[in-house]
Curated annotation (Swiss-Prot):
Pathway in which the depicted protein is active: Porphyrin-containing compound metabolism; heme A biosynthesis; heme A from heme O: step 1/1
Name of the molecule in the record: Heme A synthase
Cofactors demanded by this protein: heme b
Mode of membrane association: Multi-pass membrane protein
Length: 303
């Protein structure tokens, strides 16, 4: 059960499960299904199996079930990884972070159901689950990197790219928070057209300000990632890890901008909104991978 041969498929399945947790949370918010089980948690309408199954109850129950299964899968993964590749420096802290933040995510979700938190607190939920996802994602990448098909272990990232990548990570996380706040504050269609309502640029409500703030953050995120991408491919032309990694990040942020614009133009089409959540999830995951490589470079500086 905890054999080393299980590591790769466990990593892939756990990463996919955590992806579904992210998408499930976005689906719950987008469809207004957060109250699908009333104010009961972990029960649903005070029962293990509710009497009726309207669509909002099905969505909320499905999200809870996937979250519970993902916790079990992540526990299986981290125990197996700790046992067999715990000698790799990042495995143990990533294991603790992945489980800890997954539990914290569940507690915040439960608190939201029971005590009806305000929008600004609820917006933290997606960001916390994103940290847990990224930890599982990194464990999986480490497992596959043991084969040494890429030169990531020998990669040395210099200070300019390190600074840009740290800035990129911070800005992305701020963008994630404002995006989650847009969903929770019901501001997806606020502040008129995209990119700006040129007939009336002045925000007139809290929702307008939330939406405008997110658009400004999205523009900053795109700009920072574009600058970082250009710097990376220009200064590390022969390193596949940097070249492919930062190219993937730039493609993901382009897709993120496109789906964000289409969400507004289509009056928040559900499928487009879910892709919007998917792209930012993997963009942040890629960024944490760059940070892990950077920290290895910092350690090599000290040695």
């Amino acid at each position: 059960m905890f054999g080393k041969k299980n590591l790769k498929w466990l990593g892939v399945v756990a990463t996919l499960m955590m992806t579904f947790v992210q998408l499930g949370g976005a689906l719950v918010t987008k469809t207004g299904s957060a109250d699908g089980c009333g104010s009961s948690w972990p029960l649903c309408h005070g029962a293990l199996i509710p009497e009726f199954f309207p669509i909002d109850t099905i969505i909320e129950l499905s999200h809870r079930a996937v979250s519970a299964l993902s916790l079990l899968m992540v526990l299986w993964l981290v125990i197996t990884a700790w046992k067999h590749i715990g000698y790799i420096k990042e495995i143990k802290p990533l294991s603790i972070i992945s489980v800890g933040f997954l539990l914290l995510q569940a507690l915040i979700g439960a608190a939201a159901v029971i005590w009806q938190q305000n929008d600004y607190v609820l917006a933290l939920h997606f960001g916390i689950s994103l940290i847990s996802f990224s930890s599982v994602f990194l464990i999986t990448l480490i497992i596959f990197s043991i084969d040494q098909k890429y030169e990531a272990d020998e990669l040395y990232i210099k200070k300019p790219l390190r600074r840009l990548t740290w800035l990129m990570a911070i800005i992305i996380y701020c963008g994630v928070y404002t995006g989650a706040l847009v969903r929770h504050a019901d501001a997806s269609l606020a502040y008129g057209g995209w990119p700006l309502p040129f007939h009336d640029l002045v925000p007139h409500s809290e929702q307008d300000w939330v939406q405008l703030t997110h658009r400004i953050m999205a523009f900053i995120v795109f700009t920072i990632i574009m600058i970082t991408y250009i710097h990376a491919v220009k200064n590390y032309p022969n390193n596949r890890t940097v070249h492919y990694g930062y190219t993937a990040a730039f493609i993901l942020v382009i897709l993120q901008v496109i789906t964000g614009a289409l969400s507004i133009m289509t009056n928040v089409n559900l499928l487009i909104a879910l892709f919007h959540a998917l792209f930012i999830t993997y963009l942040f995951g890629m960024t944490t991978y760059f940070i892990m490589l950077m920290l290895r470079s910092v350690r090599s500086d000290k040695q």
